[in-house]
């Protein structure tokens, strides 16, 4: 017989609810106005973990193409005006930039974990870059 996954369900039977104090009952019944339902919220970190799994599976570029292209052209203006770029050149630049950033964030996360934290900070990124030899 195959095993099936058990899901949590609300119980219908069981013990009868205990009587509450008058002040507790008044507090609970007072704010009910029109039965407005709160929107569903996930626990902190749940959505972040889901996004991490989704982006680790994907292979598409994460930075939008046109804003990246404008940034490349703006930076290139400082070196030489009227430069032209093939679309494949900008695509190659974007691939390289995203690969670099992903690697940097991985190293930054390792620095934060080493410091017994789960949140990356500016000093983690500075340490990661210094260990890579990019910055003195």
UniProtKB/Swiss-Prot annotation:
Region feature (Disordered): 1-42
Subcellular location: Nucleus; Chromosome
UniProt PTM comment: Phosphorylated by IPL1 to form H3S10ph. H3S10ph promotes subsequent H3K14ac formation and is required for transcriptional activation through TBP recruitment to the promoters. Mono-, di- and trimethylated by the COMPASS complex to form H3K4me1/2/3. H3K4me activates gene expression by regulating transcription elongation and plays a role in telomere length maintenance. H3K4me enrichment correlates with transcription levels, and occurs in a 5' to 3' gradient with H3K4me3 enrichment at the 5'-end of genes, shifting to H3K4me2 and then H3K4me1. Methylated by SET2 to form H3K36me. H3K36me represses gene expression. Methylated by DOT1 to form H3K79me. H3K79me is required for association of SIR proteins with telomeric regions and for telomeric silencing.
UniProt organism field: Candida albicans (strain SC5314 / ATCC MYA-2876) (Yeast)
Function: Core component of nucleosome. Nucleosomes wrap and compact DNA into chromatin, limiting DNA accessibility to the cellular machineries which require DNA as a template. Histones thereby play a central role in transcription regulation, DNA repair, DNA replication and chromosomal stability. DNA accessibility is regulated via a complex set of post-translational modifications of histones, also called histone code, and nucleosome remodeling.
GO BP term, example: rRNA transcription
Residues that bear N6-acetyllysine: 10, 15, 19, 24, 28, 37, 57, 65
Keywords: Acetylation, Chromosome, DNA-binding, Methylation, Nucleosome core, Nucleus, Phosphoprotein
Modified sites of kind N6-methyllysine: 5, 10, 19, 24, 28, 37, 80
Sites bearing N6,N6,N6-trimethyllysine, chain numbering: 5, 28, 37, 80
Name of this protein: Histone H3.3
Listed GO MF terms: DNA binding; protein heterodimerization activity; structural constituent of chromatin
Family assignment from sequence similarity: Belongs to the histone H3 family.
Principal localisation: nucleus
One GO term describing the cellular component: nucleosome
Family matches, as InterPro entries: Histone-fold (IPR009072), Histone_H2A/H2B/H3 (IPR007125), Histone_H3/CENP-A (IPR000164)
Subunit structure, interactors included: The nucleosome is a histone octamer containing two molecules each of H2A, H2B, H3 and H4 assembled in one H3-H4 heterotetramer and two H2A-H2B heterodimers. The octamer wraps approximately 147 bp of DNA.
Key word DNA-binding present: yes
Modified residues (Phosphoserine): 11
Modified residues (N6,N6-dimethyllysine): 5, 15, 28, 37, 80
